[in-house]
């Protein structure tokens, strides 16, 4: 049974239609029933207490994660981005900036710079960050920016004014809708696709993507 579960799990990961195996949905569900709860051991870790503790990470700290570098810093400050890049240029930038809307999760914690209120200040905030991205990208590098429809003008203007060549807007279609206060509930997220046109841009797909 364990081997069967492993095989079906690998087929699911390969987007294979597992119904072709001859097992019905109920049989497969029974096979995986309780699998997520098995071997789960609770500990005495206090999440709330940990969140209240003073952090030892300070601005300017860089964490090395294998080949990757993670900076505690400000992407609107050129000196911070230069510190992160360490003299190198990136081949692509994928960014998901604040959407200029207040968000608070179940913990009540908020996101810094998440809500500006003033549209001009928010656009300048984006522009400062995007300019730094532009300066630290290689010639022809791609730029992807997840954003909200409500602020699409600011995101578009900041992208173009930073120097990028706007190409198109991709749509991320999500598996489920996101409940909000809007009349129509969103089930997608737009993504600006642009590139640094100081050289022919590089695209690594087969041009069949939608």
Per-range role (PLM):
Residues 1-210:
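Core catalytic lobe of class I
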